[in-house]
């Protein structure tokens, strides 16, 4: 395993080279091992995914369960906010933030927080909300009310466990789009500098055009 930033194999020339036993995914135009770069770029994306998933699912589950069931008037406001957030593309938001003084603080963790908030308050909230409205009219909820159960207790103990699969399934899919959004913004240099797949694609195209053609195994 070579250093993903400054690693250079002096025994291999010229660069880029095709996949071999020494370099399973070949080298890029600067002589760096593509596999090492790929593995180094996976760590930040894993952190992004973890932050995005848990923040998004926490927001969507708590707000999506309690507000439609307990605060019905407030739910009308949140519904409009969520509908508006659906129209906002996370890659565009990252590009806008990256054009200012926020580039250095747009780390994978902070991007995961931003994307988790957008996803949790966006489509995921509406998905959980629709499930809560449907469940709140079922017989076991009415029975719990007749027995004197408080709304917060019913929402957290009876309704929330039922809607968890809805939130989990959507956030798992949404996290994938978060990775794509970060790679997209990184390709244009609008996020903090860190090894990632977006920069690998950028280097493959940019340096390849100057130093002997694009190495397509890097792009793949």
Segments predicted by a language model, with ranges:
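Glycine-rich helix-loop "coupling/hinge" segments at transmembrane-helix boundaries
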Residues: 86, 100, 181-220
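Membrane-helix/interface signature in polytopic inner-membrane proteins
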Residues: 125-145, 150-151
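C-terminal transmembrane helix and the adjacent membrane-cytosol boundary/short C-terminal tail
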Residues: 103, 115-119, 171-172, 211-220
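Transmembrane alpha-helix boundary and packing residues in multipass membrane permease domains
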Residues: 65, 95-99, 111, 142, ...
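Transmembrane alpha-helices
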Residues: 43-59, 152-185
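Generic hydrophobic transmembrane alpha-helix motif, especially the helices
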Residues: 24, 28, 32, 55, ...
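Gly/Trp-centered helix-boundary motif
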Residues: 1-61, 65-66, 72-76, 87-91, ...
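Short helix-to-coil transition segments within interhelical loops
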Residues: 27-32, 70, 143-162
């Amino acid at each position: 395993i070579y250093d993903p930033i400054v690693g250079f194999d002096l025994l291999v020339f010229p660069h880029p080279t095709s996949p071999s036993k020494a370099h399973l995914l070949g080298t890029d135009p600067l002589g760096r091992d593509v596999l090492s770069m790929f593995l180094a770029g996976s760590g930040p994306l894993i952190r992004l995914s973890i932050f995005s998933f848990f923040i998004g699912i926490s927001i969507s589950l708590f707000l999506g369960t309690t507000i439609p069931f307990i605060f019905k008037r407030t739910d009308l406001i949140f519904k409009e906010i969520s509908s508006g957030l659906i129209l906002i593309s996370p890659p565009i938001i990252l590009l806008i933030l990256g054009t200012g003084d926020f580039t250095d603080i747009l780390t994978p963790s902070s991007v995961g927080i931003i994307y988790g908030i957008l996803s949790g308050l966006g489509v995921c909230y509406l998905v959980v909300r629709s499930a809560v409205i449907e469940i709140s009219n079922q017989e076991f909820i009415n029975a719990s009310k007749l027995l004197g159960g408080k709304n917060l207790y019913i929402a957290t103990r009876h309704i929330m466990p039922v809607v968890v699969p809805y939130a989990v399934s959507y956030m798992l899919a949404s996290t994938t789009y978060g990775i794509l959004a970060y790679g997209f913004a990184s390709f244009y240099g609008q996020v903090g500098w860190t090894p990632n797949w977006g920069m690998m694609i950028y280097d493959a195209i940019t340096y390849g055009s100057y130093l002997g053609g694009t190495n397509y195994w890097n792009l793949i």
